[in-house]
Amino acid sequence: MGWACLVIIVCAAWRPAPAHAQPGLSAAADVIFYGDNTEFRNAFSEGETMFGVAARGEARIELGNGVRLAAGVAANQRFGSESAFELVRPVLALSVRGRRSTFIFGTLETPRAATPPGPDHAGPHGLLPPLQRERLAFDRPFEAGLQWLFHGARLEHDLWLQWQRLNTAEHRERLDGGARLQWRVARTLALPLQAHIVHEGGQLFDAGPVRDSLAIASGVVISKATESGPSASPGDGSGKAATTGTLELLGLWSHHVPDRQLPQRTRDGAAFFGRAALEWRAWRTHLLMWRGDDYLKDEGDPNYQSVRRDGTRWRGIRDYAETGVTRTFVPVAGAVLEASFRYHRIEDHYEYSYRVLARVQVAGKIR
């Protein structure tokens, strides 16, 4: 049924060109090499070191008027794994692109690693880590569903809905949807809104509880940028030595339903998230602080959650903080290298982590 719908949409979008014209054809690749060492264990999270590469290659057919059909393959390979690939999926996407807006049906445009820089921005859609953990960009670098991207003078957003699993006799279907919006009110002030929900359900098979996990975040973003002339550092990806300071203050609300048939297990939580960052040339430093009360969110970073690793409830206020530094290198156009170091405080537990990323994006016209 899904494939039939896609064929119908492609046929509807295709408007025959004159006999002398042919659809444009190009090829593109997006490859992310990742090395993430958060090998520390505490009461809330397990430690794991991840090294590997997530790659996506595709052929693109330009049908005209901003309509593009893409087909290819995506794969994720973990270094040291007994399997050749942890994940292999077909890339199939129909996109309609305008001056500011892009609609995608099929394989989504994720992840966002290294754009913008910083490990705390590395999630698949750039959500706050309590809503969606950063490491999903490496655990699950492939997503498929619907997506609407918009980049305007004041408003930008990423809205999506993606299916992770079908409803079978063994398990419920699983899908997630979200929104990351920011409205620039003034040059130095913006209003963000982020939301994410994970749902498990389906009516074909009754295999387990129906679950929902929702979180919403909103607040203010204050930023100030100054330029002090040409950059003296080659390969730093910046034509000028710009200094940008950013302060984010957001409140969060969570609604966690582990089983709709057992409403007494439903938990609502609230939290505060604050982050200050300073970017200068190819360097970025950040400090973030978190205070949460009964906050629970599927796919959120466990270091922010009000539940222990063994599943027991944390009663009282949860505290988390981290500080870090990131260095970005741009040796050539289309290639970005990022190295970061972070120091974490999880209640009374202190640990450090580091991450190395390299992202290469290339595209070329065939005809």
State each model region's role:
Residues 29-43, 68-79, 155-167, 191-205, ...:
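Transmembrane beta-strand segments that form the barrel wall of outer-membrane beta-barrel proteins
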Residues 23, 59-63, 94-98, 150-152, ...:
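Residue-level signature of outer-membrane beta-barrel architecture
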Residues 25, 65-70, 100-104, 154-159, ...:
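Repeated loop/turn-to-beta-strand initiation elements of outer-membrane beta-barrel proteins
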Residues 151-277:
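Signature for the C-terminal beta-barrel architecture of outer-membrane proteins
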Residues 115-134, 260-267, 277, 282-342:
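Outer membrane beta-barrel transmembrane domains
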Residues 102-182, 197:
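Surface-exposed coil loops of outer-membrane beta-barrel proteins
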Residues 350-367:
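Outer-membrane beta-barrel "beta-signal"
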